Design a protein with these regions (language model features):
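Acidic, serine/threonine- and glycine-rich low-complexity intrinsically disordered segments
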Residues: 208-372
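Repeated scaffold domains used in trafficking and secretory/extracellular systems
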Residues: 88-101, 141-157, 221-234, 289-302, ...
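Short, conserved, GDST-rich strand-edge loop motifs in beta-rich repeat architectures
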Residues: 52-61, 165-192, 240-266, 312-314, ...
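Post-signal peptide N-terminal segment of secreted/secretory-pathway proteins
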Residues: 59-184
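Bacterial Sec-dependent N-terminal signal peptides
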Residues: 1-48
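Beta-propeller blade signature
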Residues: 63-73, 121-128, 181-205, 257-277, ...
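Beta-propeller fold detector
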Residues: 76-89, 130-144, 193, 198-222, ...
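Loop/turn-rich, solvent-exposed surfaces of beta-rich toroidal or solenoidal domains
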Residues: 346-422
Length: 457
């Protein structure tokens, strides 16, 4: 019989009495000391499932974001059934909320996306089920980065978040001293001004804000290239540089009209001093081409002293790129997902490594079936050290399994939790043991028409 979790007050009380979700097995008949090393201890944490409700079209996620939490033991139990859309907490956001969580899963951070409340930061204490208790006051950052900010939590012990935006100006034209003769005009460049704000997650305060005009090389700018989108700030291992992924667009210098048929340049990252957010520079990969801004999931992670970054829209298929401690791309590190998975046009939609350098990657490729909301997605187990990848066949796939909006994985030791479920269909939590590749089918996720699950936190 499936256990339906409709009210978590009882479980919350039990969890609190255990002391921050740490449970020790005991036997009343023997009066064993739960601190005895011979008594096995079971550590647990909250797993928060997020679902994006349909707005107008299946899979658009514009009907709101619903979250619901269970402990990790129940997340691994396929007899448990939860219904986030019927019983969940609505994360404040006009469109799909941009969620982050603390490393231990006890806190959810949210910045509302678009609408009247766009740019509003809130954080919540996770108490189980649909109980999320707001902590502190709201902070609105829209005056710094607009009402639809792109933001992530930096990996600095849950202390800081960083949000970014880019403002693209009209092309700069030199009239060469003859303002009435447009035939003599010369295209100069398209200026892109970036803004970066850092947010104190602990005290709900603005820490810093800076704006910069970030130029490309003279040749690239003369040919019409400019940064059109930035996202996914990431700290280096030393904590003194902030890397920001970027997407380039292009205008035709002869007409200043948008140019969609152009050579894709080497993948680029903007580097700022941290925490000052000053002295912007741009680094370029000679291995990967295309974008490094990702979409809705964190796109770059520090591991073993370097930052590993996914790219998208690469003509040779997505790569995982490496930025070393010298804050430059390591072009000796060549990890191409097309080659590793034996597919064409691999596109990394979201990914997350564990501390052992093994990661779960959500991806699509050129032969993905077109489903009700977009191209079918898959999961792969990746080894950053060996530069290998293998599709996780133990997870079921469906033509309507849509991962483009996927946001969150939970890392617990060497285990990675994820959600599976086609648009409008029930699914499950799955847990991947990255050391062995073993996959555990966990709790059932109950869906509603046109909606989909966007991860766990």
């Amino acid at each position: 019989m499936k256990r339906n979790f409709l009210n978590y007050k009882l479980l919350t009380g039990i969890a609190l009495s255990m002391g921050l979700m740490t449970a020790c097995s005991s036997d009343d008949s023997t009066n064993e000391d739960p601190t005895d090393p011979e008594v096995p201890a079971v550590d647990s944490r909250w797993i928060t499932v997020a679902g994006a409700k349909m707005g107008t079209n299946p899979g658009d996620g514009n009907g709101g974001t619903y979250i619901y939490s269970i402990n990790s033991e129940d997340a691994k139990d396929p007899t448990v059934s939860i219904d986030p859309f019927e019983n969940g907490f609505i994360a404040p956001s006009n469109r799909t909320a941009r969620l982050q969580s603390s490393e231990d899963g006890s806190t959810i951070f949210n910045i509302s996306y678009a609408g009247d409340t766009g740019g509003n930061y809130t954080k919540y204490d996770v108490q189980g089920g649909n109980t999320f208790q707001q902590l502190g006051t709201d902070v609105n950052i829209s005056q710094y980065v607009g009402t639809a900010p792109r933001w992530v939590k930096l990996f600095d012990g849950d202390q800081t978040g960083a949000a970014v935006y880019v403002n693209v100006a009209e092309p700069t034209i030199d009239d060469n001293g003859t303002p009435d003769d447009i035939s003599d005009d010369t295209y100069v460049r398209t200026d892109a001004t970036i803004g970066v704000v850092t947010l104190d997650l602990e005290n709900s305060l603005i820490k810093n804000f800076e704006e910069h005009s970030v130029p490309l090389s003279a040749e690239e700018e003369a040919n019409g290239y400019y940064f059109s989108r930035i996202d996914m700030p990431t700290l280096n291992a030393a904590g003194d540089k902030l890397y920001i992924g970027g997407r380039l667009s292009k205008v035709d210098p002869t007409t200043t009209e948008s140019d969609s048929d152009y050579t894709i340049l080497g993948s680029k990252t903007i580097v700022l001093d941290y925490p000052s957010l000053l002295n912007p520079t741009v680094i370029t990969s000679a291995v990967g081409h295309g974008n490094t801004n990702g979409y809705r999931s964190i796109n770059a992670f520090e591991y073993n002293g370097s930052v590993y970054q996914a790219n998208q829209s690469d003509p040779e298929g997505s790569h995982i790129l490496k930025i070393d401690a010298n804050n430059q791309y390591d072009d000796s590190y060549d990890f191409n997902l097309d080659d590793a998975l034996n597919v064409n046009g691999a596109y990394i939609l979201a990914w997350r490594p564990a501390s052992n350098g093994k990661a779960v990657v959500a991806y699509r490729h050129d032969d993905s079936v077109e489903g009700v909301a977009g191209a079918q997605g898959f999961f792969a187990l990746v080894d950053l050290n060996a530069k290998t990848a293998q599709k996780i066949d133990a997870i079921p796939y469906d033509p309507d399994f849509y991962l483009f909006q996927y946001q969150g994985f939970v890392v617990d030791g060497t285990e990675i939790y994820l959600t599976q479920g086609a648009v409008g269909e029930n699914g499950n939590i799955y847990i991947v043991e990255t050391e062995t590749g073993e996959v555990t089918k966990g709790a059932e996720l109950v869906n509603i028409e046109g909606s989909h699950f966007i991860g766990v936190f």
